[in-house]
Amino acid sequence: MPVFSKLGLKSSSALGANRHIVIDGVADGYEAFCLIRLAEEIGERGPIMYIVRDGQRIADLEQVLSFVAPDMPVLHLPAWDCLPYDRVSPGADASARRLAALSALSQLKKAPHPAIILTTANAVLQKLPPEAAIAEQVISARPGNQLDMNDLASRLERNGFERVSTVRDIGEFAVRGGILDLYAPGAEEPLRLDFFGDTLESIRAFDPATQRTTGTRKEFVLQPMSEITLSPDMISRFRKNYVAMFGAPQRDDALYQAISEGRRFAGMEHWLPLFYDKLDTVFDHAGNMPVVFDHLVHEALTERHTMVVDHYEARLRQAEGKEPGSDAVPYKPVKPETLYLTPSEVEKHAEAGGMRIDLTPFGAPEVTGRTIIHADVHKGRSFAEERAATDVNLFEAVVKHIAELRAAGRKVLVAAWTEGSLDRLLQVLDEHGLEKIESVDRLSTVKALSRDKVTAAVLAVESGFDAGDLVIVAEQDILGDRLIRRSKRRKRDQDFI
């Protein structure tokens, strides 16, 4: 599948009656290029959602997507950054980014346009607050609008903001006379709201270190910071649902006491179903947008759901006194099905939507009910043999390979992970005879340049690929694996509890 050509999916005749597409032969590193084609063609009337197997791939995908199509909107819906049934809440930044993404998703449904929603297997398994409940918590105002400062301060406290004397960190707010300072997650700078009575007079950004004004703003939009807002209605709903699920609370039930008093409790998000009459899924928020599955997502969904069930059962054993830590603060877990989908439910939701698309590096067999599209993108050449050989110059072999590709009329892009590593790599290749190298920052420049030029870019791909009209030679293909060691997790229930 050439990089610079269309997939040919704009017409329904290209798909037949099938709404399930499998694109096979998608080599590692080509996913972002394929996503852009999908977003531009089948997503022409709205966004597409891409589910990746783990969150570590998201940042790399975002970087490559910005190279392939800088103007394509990309939205990231992260998962909670804590374990299932944990005693701690998800981080404030992760929660705020989730809610900001859901609010943006709601706007995309109202005014559809091509965009890519990146999310993970962990994120799609977990249920979410209803769309209407999130929309009710969004606050926006301009200078001259009527806005009750005391009501705003109360809403900030209920939403998880910490009241302080001087705002310096994200998630803090302060009130001094007719001035309210707040630092919202996701904001580049904190804001200073100046009130005259119930009228918002001005909005100014300021430096949290010096407290000095850095500029003015025409508007501020405050997204919810937490998936739980301790309003009187929500507290009442929690109390009713808690008693219905667990029976009358005991005196030592710290969770029930804290929520009843309107105080936030560490880890209360793990009882999210008790705060709402009904939770939504990611697919409810997304509507009928096409859903694209990364390779191995099903395995990631199964692994995560197994972890959810394991941790739930560990909490039950703890409550029954059969587990180390049983003398700790009581923990009454909600059933997994109230907070999480199963892998099969995720599959059903995806298939019930507008279209399901699977990406795989392998060949896919023809099966009734789905359309197979052959990407025919191959993994790039590895220079492992040249690295191991003592009588071969590695970089001369790379230069020779690139020369052969250019002679065949192929466009070549040399990719590295950082500016520094790219500069060093190009310097060495130049010393070994590579000529006409031009650094680029977007794919359109690669397309516009003549084929006799070799382009180079910072690109977060593990390995290169051959897409026919473009060959990417990656830093890792030449120099070998990067020396990054990731700590291994050991799943021990007693450590979790």
Model-identified regions with their sequence ranges:
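Conserved beta-alpha structural segments and adjacent helices that either
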Residues: M1-I497
